[in-house]
Amino acid sequence: MASIMKRGNTYSVRYNYKDHAGKPCKGWETFKTKAEAQERKITVEKELLDGTFLVPDTMTVEEMLYKWIPIQSSKHKWSPKTYTQSVAMVQNLIVPYIGKRKVQDLRTYDIEPFYATLSQTPCGQYVHGEKQELTENQKKRLLSSTSIHEVHTLLKTAFSYAVDWDLIHKSPTPREAPKINTEERTIWDERTMLAALQTIENPALHLAVHMSMILSLREGEILGLQPSDLDFGAADGRGTISVNKALQRADKVALSKIDPTQIYHTFPDRREGSKSSLILKRTKTKKSNRILYMTKPLKEELLAWLEKMKQDEQNAPEKYSNCGQLFRLPDGLPIAPDVLTKWYRMWRAEHPEFEKIVFHGLRHSSATYQLLQSGGDFKSVQGNTGHATATVLMDTYAHTQDKPRLELTEKIEADFYSQDVAGAKPQEPPENKTPVATKITGKMILEAIRQMDAEERRELTRVLFA
């Protein structure tokens, strides 16, 4: 089945095999010593006999990834954002470093140094696969551990397909993912949120911030709302909001590659030759579709906003283009995410007295506030926030404000140091009696959760929601 031929100072192993299409082929591998050649001959014959022979293939990592992306995108119905981010990751963080390597030649000991290289790589070193000239300050801003972890996750999935395609026997990705150096997000407490809200004069921004603070809505979910999603008479007159869509700006190339059923509507371009489009799409996950309850002040603001939109249309009906969205510009066109972000940044620059947080930080602040108010009712708060799992919510809650911890310290101080220890006797060993059950309060559980690390919180979630 295989033979060895001496050629000069080397030894060649020759064998016959069939490629993936069943076509007969000849294999030829060269070794420095006869012992190596004999060992390879035995291995090849065994693999050909039991059907585990790996057909030689010259496919590179770059070729494999660009073959995998459309398959994965179609199979898992990627959103335009996920498609764009994945392509950018391949173009800028993988191909420039290991893209030309053959898939069959790559080993785990090649991937580890690759991760180390990325950890010392500046952000934006490559854009669309082209190396960029960076300033000295730009060179100091290195890729985050989160970005490197995302590269690992993508490669792990892609190489699992390579195994299924019989390109390789096992994935070269390391078993242990690169560690993520998590930093606590900056959030506001309830007093700061209310104080900040009271300083916002832009009506559209005020309403959007109000909804994010009270309902923990994502930016795209807020802008994706339509008047028909509001039911002011529901819940005995309290009013409800149905969240089932999201507004997003998406790359046109990505839109042409993904499942079109994910997109409900594509808005007309405002600029000729634009490379992106404003779209109305499905929400992030199934759990993101939810019914939320209005507070009385929010209900009043929503009614006032609807009245304002009517006035805008009546003031200039010939120039008004009703886009159908709840959040509109005075001309009726939709408020895009980048516009809302611009307004928020302008307001933030005018009010440096508030600790700097991004718009999405309002959602995290809201989730933390709701958990504190509910006494740690994770399921109820998860229903409000639309987090995919309670684990994600727990990780958000892990950085809760210092106030409860400070209050706990004050209680310990008041109790511990005020004890009367005069004449106190040494504690006697406990008798072998059944211990009296201790009443565990919600606050005790919350404090225990705050002290947990990420792994302990994930295990707790698995037990609670299995």
Residue locations for each model-derived region?
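N-terminal DNA-binding recognition helix of tyrosine site-specific recombinases/integrases
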Residues: 1, 89, 93, 101-109, ...
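Catalytic-site neighborhood detector that most strongly recognizes the C-terminal catalytic loop/helix
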Residues: 179-180, 187, 238, 245-249, ...
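Short, polar N-cap/turn motifs at the start of nucleic acid-interacting alpha helices
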Residues: 229-237, 375-398, 425
